[in-house]
Amino acid sequence: MEEPKCLQREMYKSVMTENYQCVLSLGYPIRKPEIVSMMEVGEELWSKNDSARPGQKEVEGETPKESDWAAENCKRAQMHKEVLDLDTLAAVKSEPVEEGSNSAKKSHICSHYGKLFSCYAAVVRHQRMHQLQKSHHCPHCKKSFVQRSDFIKHQRTHTGERPYQCVECQKKFTERSALVNHQRTHTGERPYTCLDCQKTFNQRSALTKHRRTHTGERPYRCSVCSKSFIQNSDLVKHLRTHTGEKPYECPLCVKRFAESSALMKHKRTHSTHRPFRCSECSRSFTHNSDLTAHMRKHTEFRNVLNLDSVVGTDPLSSQNVASSPYSCSKCRKTFKRWKSFLNHQQTHSREKPYLCSHCNKGFIQNSDLVKHFRTHTGERPYQCAECHKGFIQKSDLVKHLRTHTGEKPFKCSHCDKKFTERSALAKHQRTHTGEKPYKCSDCGKEFTQRSNLILHQRIHTGERPYKCTLCDRTFIQNSDLVKHQKVHANLPLSDPHTANSPHKCSKCDLTFSHWSTFMKHSKLHSGEKKFQCAECKKGFTQKSDLVKHIRVHTGEKPFKCLLCKKSFSQNSDLHKHWRIHTGEKPFPCYTCDKSFTERSALIKHHRTHTGERPHKCSVCQKGFIQKSALTKHSRTHTGEKPYPCTQCGKSFIQNSDLVKHQRIHTGEKPYHCTECNKRFTEGSSLVKHRRTHSGEKPYRCPQCEKTFIQSSDLVKHLVVHNGENPPAATAFHEILIRRENLTRSEPDPYPCTECGKVFHQRPALLKHLRTHKTEKRYPCNECDKSFFQTSDLVKHLRTHTGERPYHCPECNKGFIQNSDLVKHQRTHTGERPYTCSQCDKGFIQRSALTKHMRTHTGEKPYKCEQCQKCFIQNSDLVKHQRIHTGEKPYHCPDCDKRFTEGSSLIKHQRIHSRIKPYPCGVCGKSFSQSSNLLKHLKCHSEQNPPVALSSELGFVAETQTHPDPVDHIVYGDTASYISPEAAGERSFKCNDCGKCFAHRSVLIKHVRIHTGERPYKCSQCTRSFIQKSDLVKHYRTHTGERPYKCGLCERSFVEKSALSRHQRVHKNESPVLNSAMEQQQVTYWGESKDDPNSLVPQLHVIKEEESPHIVNAYSPLSILQSYFPPILEPKGTPRYSCSECGKCFTHRSVFLKHWRMHTGEQPYTCKECGKSFSQSSALVKHVRIHTGEKPYPCSTCGKSFIQKSDLAKHQRIHTGEKPYTCTVCGKKFIDRSSVVKHSRTHTGERPYKCNECTKGFVQKSDLVKHMRTHTGEKPYGCNCCDRSFSTHSASVRHQRMCNTGRPYQDEEYENSLFYSADITWKGDYAQLLQIPCGLEEPMKAIGWISEVAL
């Protein structure tokens, strides 16, 4: 009986497995039934005690009963029947799955998760899984499960139990199936084979996913962008790109990741743990993918030993095999993977099977064709979430994202420098290692980059792939072809000399290619000079040389350049000059492939390769490449300066130096840039300038790879790395190499033995050596200051004599040095020759560009030794160090005040002298600082010039239609009216609200209002601020610092504006009290009696009868927003008058806030309750009502307040301070509002009028209460009887009566007993009292009210 049961069980297992395999073979995504999982791991299916299954335990101590076991088996059988119904399978088989079909052909969608199916029966079967009851609930996380086995597996995630252990590596697993899959990594078993490509897998799920690559099935679709995925996990990861969710956070550096695997890889960067070890060579890896790639080196090499015929090389050495098992027989390049090797071989066969249908361009790989095709379609599927920039390749997006994150993942192990790309790191590391991996097979020369090797090899092969279409001349580099083609622009030049030199001189071994040239040279040795000049008796060997010499006396220059009109005495000089315009260099060096414009320059250059120095100094035996260099050098020994200037008497060693000097007097600039038409006095300056257009930077720093246009900039930069005295070996090695490549030959440099610095000339070296010996031989007789060089002394003496020999022809301003004049003239011409390559910003001086470039590179080379703070400029470091030393070297002689900076002293002295040297050319207004003038100039529009207007009074200009509160502008006789359309340039616009600003910095601060960004955080209370200045002010609340002190009462203030407001109390200049003045004094600009062309401040008294004309004082609101208002005297007099109530204000901001009281404008709205406010500060305070925030605590009693002003008033209760005094009766008050209310008892003023009955009130709150008598509003309700009241006090009295049981008066009866009366004061606080009808004495009313209130 037992044997048939066993056979029946085996048959059941076989049928179930076959049915499940059938479904999988169709490519249908089906959830694996639990019974199939049990069969795969070898569990018993018919055990009556489920707890006896291996790996399962009893849950909460319960043992399943036999009835439960039977019900469970029935339930499972029903599930299997539903899932594996043969009729359904037949329906599935009836719909053939086409190869390459995708999810778009699956029209049946699951309503729960959106999963796609090819037939309706599959959807029905799938949806039954959602309808199953989840009866197993996890007590830890409330998760539910349909099957008990899934519930038991889930519980192990909470308990950490891993009952299945691998006997090979001791690794543990929660499920037996996971252990079986893992063991296949040791055995190498891959039992699941793809029928299409025969690829094998160790897990069935991997085969299922792989099958979808053949069928094109992508069952998981994104509901946002409709993109489909093969796996559900890929869809989950993709959805995070839409939501921005990064749920995995690193506990060490708080960095977040979208995937857990990325977090695991990242965590290993914090530790040295390498958990993945190679079993063959014991090498360890941080990531499993690295180990997998490494393992292929071992497994693929075993295969490559049998593929010698394919590889085409001899057996590889063990060293090469360990790294790259596949070697190319043509170029000897090695590869780690077979596929990469096959792709590479196609580059030699030039087979490009993938053709573009648009341009017929061929590609080796299909992926390259896909990327190329996007250049035609414009598709950029990879978009940056920060700036929405699109990219064709994902790798480009990854590199781009690093510009936003600042991430530089590739770090140099030598200098800790970081790079965004691995290739940049590889190139950089070669500067440390000196590695030159690209070696020439012909001459053994090595190069750091492959591109340089390719160019070099063309010297050996003779390959010149770039051909001129006009003259068939060929070139090694494309850049040489481009330069050559400029020759054909206008003038045809002669062919270059050949390299053949058959004629050799027996005296000096010089060779010549032409016989005539050789004969001319021979006469130099014979000394024969039969052609003599009649003027100076100088002799020449040839008549042509005499003709040329005579032109020196006559000044004749018959050869003229057609482009720049420059003339020359010889035709050869014209030809040489013409090459400056064409850029042609017809004389190439075959050693280094450098080209030259002249043959003589090539001969001199060639000596740098051979080391030949034929011209030696008889004094110091120093050798020189050129004879002219020896002649110049000899004058350093003799002190001879044979070339004097006829205008200033200055002498020079070289004639070229004299020519350059004379251009200072004549103003000649013969060197012309063809790009920007700029002219220069020296050819070297033009060469340097051209590099700003071409971007060439030939001088490279050997330490940081930074490049420079000039060698002097490199020398200055090297000080950053090596300090003030850089070693010669590291600092100037690169300079010497570049110097060999200069277009002109130069004598050997003079190195300093102290610091290794190199100089071109010996006098420069001698001057430099004095800096080490601290020898200053040139003292000043005026101030005893000494200098190293006499030129420095001459410049310094001009500061005493006041001599400024260099004058500007535009403004006649004088300067001590010519360089200062050159810089100044650029302010007139607008020339900015130094352009930033990053943002195209232009600068007048090179030093300004250098400083600006550091804002892009982040370089701060000047570090403070005390606090390690770094600065971009050395001057900033000097100023900063004064903070530590407390030094204030700049002293005011008038008030003995000291300053850390000279500019601060200059600005301060203008307070004493009242000098305002910066006048506005439009309106004549003057300013003490240039920055204020620049801000003011933006108020004037260039499109609408000012038009002078006048009235009968001579100073009032009226506007026609302006709804703004102020309608007039008051100026002097020569004042100009600026229309609202000319309201200043505001070129920076906010994209959110359309508001415009004159300065970019103001726009940046404004944008933070929309974004909510508050980058400045307080370290004491974690409060944040939009501006740094606000943080500084706030920090004083913690430190107690009050830097602004009143000179009259010794009171201190946190802000300067608070001090200004306080000082008005002493001067009796309250803007509120000034509104009652019968006449006002206004200062305006008028003509001076002494000089009609100048504007001076004039005082005008505005009388009572003139007030109708000027009650709407000074200027339209639109102009106020872009204008500096007219100067008002005396200081503190109100400048802004309200046209509605006549009230005057000193500050425009206070006036604008006041004006909103009349207009009712409330632009600031609360998002919580919709309430609006006229001021942003009121909104901020209101929001704290919702949040409950009270950031201002009292240090005495601990009570907190929403506003700082409330805290200040509260603290006066503890101190007893009453700083506000009534000027009439001398009574004192705690706050200013109390004294204002009190002052109305003297004046009888009632500013708050009721629109219904014209009744007046002293306080606005009384008006609000009164208005409820008209509207009937009763906002205060009783909690006991639902009765409502119009005032809070009435509600409080009523609730007391409800609580105590005492009767209460009817509110209408109470209101009928009262009428509004004068203000009566009790104690220190003003209270508005309502007097009962018939009671004349207010004090009796006070007693009556007190009695009722009790």
From Swiss-Prot:
Residues 1-58 form the KRAB domain. GO terms for cellular component: cytoplasm. Disulfide bonds: none annotated. Keywords: Cytoplasm, Metal-binding, Phosphoprotein, Repeat, RNA-binding, Zinc, Zinc-finger. It comes from the Eukaryota. One of its GO terms (molecular function) is RNA binding. It is found in: Cytoplasm. A zinc finger (C2H2-type) spans 108-130, 136-158, 164-186, 192-214, 220-242, 248-270, 276-298, 326-348, 354-376, 382-404, 410-432, 438-460, 466-488, 503-525, 531-553, 559-581, 587-609, 615-637, 643-665, 671-693, 699-721, 750-772, 778-800, 806-828, 834-856, 862-884, 890-912, 918-940, 988-1010, 1016-1038, 1044-1066, 1136-1158, 1164-1186, 1192-1214, 1220-1242, 1248-1270, 1276-1298. The keyword Zinc applies. Phosphorylated. Phosphorylation enhances RNA binding. SUPFAM superfamilies: beta-beta-alpha zinc fingers, KRAB domain (Kruppel-associated box). InterPro entries: C2H2-ZF_domain, KRAB, KRAB_dom_sf, Znf_C2H2_sf, Znf_C2H2_type. Binds to poly-G sequences in RNA. May function in post-translational regulation processes. This is Zinc finger protein Xfin. It comes from Xenopus laevis.
